[in-house]
Amino acid sequence: MSDELRIIISGGGTGGHIFPAVSIADAIRRKRPEAKILFVGAEGRMEMQRVPAAGYEIKGLPIAGFDRKRLWRNIAVVMKIIKCRKLAAGILKDFRPQVAVGVGGYASGPTLNVAESMGVPTVLQEQNSYAGVTNKLLAKKAAKICVAYDGMERFFPADRILLTGNPVRAGLTAPKCTNEDAVKSFGLQPGKRTVLLIGGSLGARTMNESVLGNLPLIKAQTDVQFIWQTGKYYSAEINEEMSRRGKPDNLYFSDFISDMATAYAAADLVISRAGAGSISEFCLLGKPVILVPSPNVAEDHQTKNALALVQKDAAIYVPDENARRTLLPLAINTVNDNAKLQSLAENILKLAKPNAADDIADIVIALAERTK
């Protein structure tokens, strides 16, 4: 067999799975430029565009997740899984990987399950503090399990766990501009406290309604300003509302912020959902954060992610059902509290794992070398 490394990386569905996957691939390629890397994702999901844009080949499986509310619909899902296992087997036979890496998401289940049945060593990358069902099943045969939180032996064999942290998207740790320039780029005033609200690329209704319900409070702030990513799903509705009510001068809003490094550089305080990837970014940057976990995720894992930080005084937690009423007043009080900001920043920075992508790449490469 050739000396080149051949590695499959499977998963996706959301940026929280895709960014770590690409970061791992980039780290492998930096260390071993000759490595052949193939992604396996889910047809119709964002990885089918994001991965090729990052310079990697991807194969798609016609996979979908289980419907946890309407169980009768899962008959079709089971049939798709059977089909996807056959397709994954064909991909694995053609590509002949020495290692298969799973980062979570619909495609990782059948791909890694088939890889394990074919004797291909697997590496799991579990981003959350509460492991999902698929990873718990795959972990029984996984060679290595890379995690971002302490205490994951609750879910996985302790002798195969490695505390690596979560890889984050490229470019965050080397901001392209100063805080002053970053604030100016959003049309806001340097020297004022700045709150960044991000509800994900599609948006978060509760967080958006918190802003819309507190526009008079926002307008009344003379020393606090806001950068608000509304999400594409709510764009038309919010544009119409702002046209009707008038946009405060101290509020910048957009359906999507493509340059998150600049947005983070501008922010004194962040308000966000509690996805594992986002939390890893806040840790790496030492950003004070208020977390509003999404109630619409499997096993309520975002709440568990948030509480893992709250237990270490590294974040503030607001339940989704309370956000409409309490989120904006709390954010304004917090961003004006220097001692609180400093404490949050220091404590969250302690949780950072800045070398996560390189550490995981080293694990994958070492395993591949032994398998060749």
Outline where the language-model segments fall.
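C-terminal alpha-helical cap of glycosyltransferases
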Residues: 353-372
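A short, well-ordered alpha-helix in the C-terminal region of glycosyltransferases
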Residues: 340-354
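Conserved donor-binding/catalytic loop of nucleotide-activated donor transferases
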Residues: 118, 265-267, 281-292, 312
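Donor-nucleotide binding loops and adjacent catalytic segments primarily
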Residues: 45-46, 50, 54, 177-184, ...
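Conserved nucleotide-sugar phosphate-binding/catalytic loop shared by glycosyltransferases and other
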Residues: 4-12, 34-79, 85, 232-234, ...
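Acidic donor-binding loop of glycosyltransferase active sites
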Residues: 97-99, 265-279, 287
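Active-site-proximal region of nucleotide-activated glycan assembly enzymes
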Residues: 57, 116-180, 188
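Glycosyltransferases and closely related glycan-assembly transferases
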Residues: 87-101, 107-123, 136-141
